[in-house]
Amino acid sequence: MISNPKYGWCNFELGDFKGSPSYLTDVPVDLLVAFIDQHAKGRGVAWFDEEGTEFTLVLTPYSMFIIEEKESPVLHDFSEINIKDLEKELIEDLEKDLNGWSEFITDDDREEILQHSNEIRQKIVMLKEMI
């Protein structure tokens, strides 16, 4: 789902959709919160800035969409994808490169990186408990 957190950019793939979110949004935390909210509130949203374009992941109990904002809005329907499988994939992607994701939106401040790492870990634990 997400990979390659380098130089303030990463890769996002869902079905046939590909995006390149930037450091302007906290990609790992925003995704974790969207999935946690979907369990807790019945809906979750994560918005991503690609610096010139943007896209939004929308989760409901029965559907999953990406709204792509380029020249004109495009709606991608991923309702056939199993959300639990996607949650497991997200957790695996984050745990595979926790150091890279911890540094994604931070400067070289070691304390800030540690805090971000702890936040990601805590949210992973929360999501695992909900799956």
Protein language model regions, located:
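N-terminal low-complexity, intrinsically disordered segments
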Residues: 1-73, 77
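Long protein-protein interaction modules used by eukaryotic assembly/scaffold proteins
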Residues: 56-131
